[in-house]
């Protein structure tokens, strides 16, 4: 399997995704904003459609449009403070509307199925460099703003009182999430990308350990999910994103069962 260059590229890409998605997903889950990943992933579909119709690399189109959608979500929070789910519905409507309009217009001649469902055949060396650049940007930004993001995740109002520039940090977080999505969609697919942001984190939370240990556990579960999903999708000839999502849910169910059995014995 590893004698093929495309599989080696796919494993490197999966490793980067396994590091990035839980890092961003932890922030979303703790803020009870898990569906934001799904909304932004659909925003990336519109970005890919716009980029392909304009002859731009789809990865960059995905990043810039998804970042714009993320900024729009934060902007709308000021008008719908108690209705975050409504904001996501508005953004989903905008993104899907743009994507469907362009896809049905005949302006797009390329096949974008690989972006919808993921593919291990289309990750080139150029894509890896783009993913690496976006990964460095995401990890570096989150590391610089780690403490502020942690305060916001647990109690935004108290963080504001303590002097944290919540609005600015939220905009930065939206851009980082957008970069993560742009780096991941080619191998995971737009339709199931949000599962890699949230399910490994949900699995790690079952262990009931501290924040840093939970984050480390989420990394490990994410790597396990993506590795198994990639290997099985290769041998079964199915889309890697969908199978990885199935694996992640199965692992979550197993961890829940094992932790419940362990607690019942104590």
From Swiss-Prot:
Localization terms from the record: Cell inner membrane
Disulfide cysteine pairs (residue numbers): none
InterPro entries membership: ABC_BtuC-like, ABC_TroCD
Transmembrane segments annotated in the record for this chain: 10-30, 34-54, 56-76, 88-108, 120-140, 172-192, 211-231, 238-258
Protein's membrane topology: Multi-pass membrane protein
Main location: membrane
Name this protein carries in UniProt: Probable metal transport system membrane protein TP_0036
Naturally occurring in which organism (per UniProt): Treponema pallidum (strain Nichols)
